[in-house]
Amino acid sequence: AEESWIQNEIDDIAIAMMEKFNKKEAWIFNTLQLYRNDRIAHLEMLLKLAKEKNFFVGLKLVRGAYHEQEIERAKEKGYDCPVHTAKENTDIDYNKALTLCIENIDFVSVCAGTHNEESSVLLIELLEKHSISKDDKRVYFSQLLGMSDHISYNAAKAGFNVVKYVPYGPVKDV
């Protein structure tokens, strides 16, 4: 995931690669930053395209990491801000995206990158509602190493798929 002024090109490449390589299952994943106010529409487009072209969608859902930079750049360049200015709207869109992914699990694999307890509980409830096994390989919980360990460890202990992600590189870059 990158800033909005870079992400569209990444999205185009990721979609082309999903269409080419995700014929039987998701191998290629892209990140959706749900603090962007256009991501639900993007997700809906991606789901429609995957159905039409018969490929699997691989997604990591996150809230977003470049909020201040996005707002500043939009002001500097004079365009509409591409991110939600209220965190509640980001939370709403994150949970909506999570719901859309689980409702379309027949052709979606999702990694729920969240430190938010409510979204984690929602994912568990959605899996139960749709009779999806806790250890279904299409669904993962993910948290940054050293953060929200209570979510990671409790979900793993309960039998859910959990990964910790580790930023790599100089501290100033990660």
Locations of regions flagged by a protein language model:
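Positively charged, amphipathic and often flexible ligand-engagement surfaces
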Residues: A1-V174
